[in-house]
Amino acid sequence: MKIADIRTYCLSTLLETPFAYSQGWVKQRWATLVEVTTDSGLTGWGESICMGLQPPEIAAAAIEHALKPILIGADPRDLEVLWHRMYHHTRDYGQKGAMMGALSGVDIALWDIAGKSLGVPVHRLLGGAFRTRVEAYATGFYRIQGQGEAKRLAAEATVHWKNGFRAMKVKLGFGIDDDLAVMQAVRDALAGKPATLMIDTNHAYGVADAIRLGRALEDVGLRLYEEPVAPEFPEGYCAVHDALDIPIAGGENEYTLFGFRNFLAQESVDIAQPDLCCCGGFTAAKHIGALAHAHGVQVNPHIWGSAIGQAASLQWIASIPVAHHALFALEPIFEYDTSSHPFRAELVKEPVLQKDGWIEVPRRPGIGVEVNRAVLEQYAAKR
């Protein structure tokens, strides 16, 4: 079997209601999808994440001009070989960022082909499923005004509860006083209802303010405090980690085994959050997972993107061992973004859907998606 072609699809659509996280306003949804075709007729799908405000054309250009020429004619099942070929070819200019996202999308598609060629889901190739269903947590609580939205966000918490979620992650980073008002309102709305809360500031604060916010919320029993400071500042992570009795999480903006080696060696986080669609794909993810396990750090993937990224991440999360074995161990949970995203339910025949706060792990070959090509045409970005 040989790789015959690699195509990218840049999707874009304006949002009816723009929303904000701490780093800016999201006014449209983007996606960079990757299709690898073979001379045998098998096709694999992957996704290169459009993180934050990243346009899809960046990763698409990297795939077309840097990766595709060195992969045509190769056996797509040579997963480690091709990952290293791509990495070494782009190392001098692409160890992180959009270039690594491009590599990730291709790698995911190759694993999809490998699974399909054997008739097994990718989690089987990764060593099997530790779990056949995964608890989902609602990521949301984005802003539509900026500040002063505690009442609306409290109502959102109630909606998530009614929709079956028993774990929720609240987006903060809009000023500490506003953050605390939001958290109090959310807690009041969920009073008497068993719910696990998490917070994510998307690196909005420096060390002093990150610690100040955490100390004010130490009595909440947070499952995690995500990205308290900037990803380039591991010393800051260490300072926050040492100052608080809250599990610290981070890593969505870190890449490959090499990046996580430095991140984990400083004992800066309790929970590592690589994103499959930018950390280097399945090939890098399994190495990052082994490294984290050796450091006693739980891996809980960051998940953002289309139905393809979600499906691939579900395969990975099924295969992740717990960091601390126990009869009632803390299991990885699935980040279920509840904001508007048309490239999910519409894009594939059987999207990732939660029911009563849980997601079943599919056993379809590869990553388990069948793409609706009409959606690729409907949302094609104009170049």
Question: What is the predicted function of each stretch?
Answer:
Residues 365-383:
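Extended hydrophobic packing segments that form well-structured cores
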Residues 65, 215, 221, 232-358:
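Shared catalytic-loop signature of beta/alpha-barrel
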Residues 127-244:
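Metal-dependent enolase-superfamily TIM-barrel catalytic cores that perform enediolate-based chemistry
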Residues 1-5, 9, 116, 120-132, ...:
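N-terminal amphipathic alpha-helix/helix-capping segment at the start of soluble metabolic enzymes
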Residues 3, 34, 41, 67, ...:
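Conserved, mostly hydrophobic/aromatic
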Residues 103, 171-175, 202-203, 226-230, ...:
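Glycine- and other small-residue-rich loops at beta-strand/loop junctions that grip anionic moieties
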Residues 1-40, 45-52, 340-347:
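Structured beta-strand/loop patches that form or line metal/cofactor-binding pockets in enzymes
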Residues 37-117:
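Metal- or metallocofactor-binding catalytic centers and their adjacent structured scaffolds
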